[in-house]
């Protein structure tokens, strides 16, 4: 049944393996780590390392990590992404489809699903609040590739970022206040963002400035002083220097500054996933507690919270 409304939304996130198995993880990581936006090493140097060392060794290990956070309905990121798309479609009364930069459903399949519903103009909403070439620009690259496979290219608009949007900041602040009401307030609120190599920022990627702005605005919304809130970067790999301070190193040392009860959130992640549920709520909790911490509280991502959906709807309306 074709829609009378010729506009639709493509909700985009990074993606996830189809299942928590070594072969599925290997397929996903191969696609992800082949992207020059993610790893910009010369291909003749990088590909032998990727296929000869990283994928054979990392895939089984990462599969076990995925298995530890896998939900009955599937991967956490996919479960929450589907819920977001369903709620946003109901909120806007227009077609909304998912498209992942890597894995399934692909960006191409997302466009095809919208076109099949009669959509002629697509609003693309990458769920990356803070812009980075490694994420947002990779979506743009993927769209270009997808259009090559479509018989007719739809008109489209692209929401680049929303790191300082008032509704995004308030949704974050509300989630913190709500968590504090239920669990109590810690000594310090740490905002952990996915890291990128420092070299990328040195070459002009504006990601760290966006992360800093989000943290500052969130602190203002919560009425926190600079010694009550801070930020760090997680998920680094390889030997190259990444953006600092590092989340794990911060958690190792912050107890010596009198912080025994910490609250940690991940504002750059729109949905809970391996990096939030296993790396932060699992691994990094252990680091903090072993360093002398007494209480570690992970504040979940916005996921399919109503205020998060309201914000998405407002972003889409700005393009209608």
Swiss-Prot record:
Biological process according to GO: heme biosynthetic process
Record PANTHER family: FERROCHELATASE, FERROCHELATASE, MITOCHONDRIAL
EC top class, as a word: lyase
Binding site for Fe cation: 194, 275
UniProt family annotation: Belongs to the ferrochelatase family.
Pathway participation: Porphyrin-containing compound metabolism; protoheme biosynthesis; protoheme from protoporphyrin-IX: step 1/1
Residue runs in coiled coils: none
Species of the source: Vibrio parahaemolyticus serotype O3:K6 (strain RIMD 2210633)
CDD domains with a match to the protein in the record: Ferrochelatase_C, Ferrochelatase_N
EC number, as in UniProt: 4.98.1.1
Functional summary from the UniProt entry: Catalyzes the ferrous insertion into protoporphyrin IX.
Top-level taxonomic group: Bacteria
A GO molecular-function annotation: metal ion binding
Pfam families, per the entry: Ferrochelatase (PF00762)
InterPro entries: Ferrochelatase, Ferrochelatase_AS, Ferrochelatase_C, Ferrochelatase_N
Localisation per UniProt entry: Cytoplasm
NCBIfam families on file: hemH
Keyword terms: Cytoplasm, Heme biosynthesis, Iron, Lyase, Metal-binding, Porphyrin biosynthesis
Main localization, broad class: cytoplasm
Name of the protein this chain belongs to: Ferrochelatase
């Amino acid at each position: 049944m074709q829609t009378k409304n010729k506009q639709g939304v493509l909700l985009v996130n990074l993606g996830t393996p189809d299942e928590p198995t070594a072969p599925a993880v290997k397929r996903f990581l191969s696609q992800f780590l082949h992207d020059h936006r993610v790893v910009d090493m010369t291909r003749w140097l990088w590909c032998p390392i990727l296929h000869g060392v990283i994928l054979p060794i990392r895939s089984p290990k990462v599969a076990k990590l995925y298995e530890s956070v896998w939900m009955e309905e599937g991967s956490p990121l996919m479960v929450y992404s589907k819920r977001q798309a369903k709620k946003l479609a109901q909120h806007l009364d227009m077609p909304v489809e998912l498209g992942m930069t890597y894995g399934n459903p692909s960006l191409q399949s997302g466009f095809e699903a919208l076109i099949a519903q009669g959509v002629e103009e697509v609003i693309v909403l990458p769920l990356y609040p803070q812009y980075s070439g490694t994420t947002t620009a990779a979506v743009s690259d993927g769209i270009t590739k997808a259009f090559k496979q479509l018989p007719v290219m739809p008109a489209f608009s692209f929401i680049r970022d929303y790191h300082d949007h008032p509704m995004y900041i308030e949704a974050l602040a509300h989630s913190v206040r709500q968590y504090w009401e239920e669990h109590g307030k810690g000594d310090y609120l740490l905002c952990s963002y996915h890291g990128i190599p420092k070299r990328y920022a040195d070459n002009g990627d504006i990601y760290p400035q966006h992360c800093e702005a989000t943290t500052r605005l969130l602190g203002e919304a919560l009425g926190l002083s600079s010694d009550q809130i801070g930020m760090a970067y997680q998920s680094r790999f390889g030997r190259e220097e990444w953006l600092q301070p590092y989340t794990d190193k911060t958690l190792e040392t912050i107890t010596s500054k009198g912080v025994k009860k910490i609250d940690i959130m991940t504002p750059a992640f729109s949905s809970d996933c391996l990096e939030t549920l296993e790396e932060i709520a699992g691994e990094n909790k252990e680091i903090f507690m072993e360093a002398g911490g007494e209480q570690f509280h992970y504040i979940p991502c916005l996921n399919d919270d109503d205020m998060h959906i309201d914000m998405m709807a407002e972003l889409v309306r700005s393009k209608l």
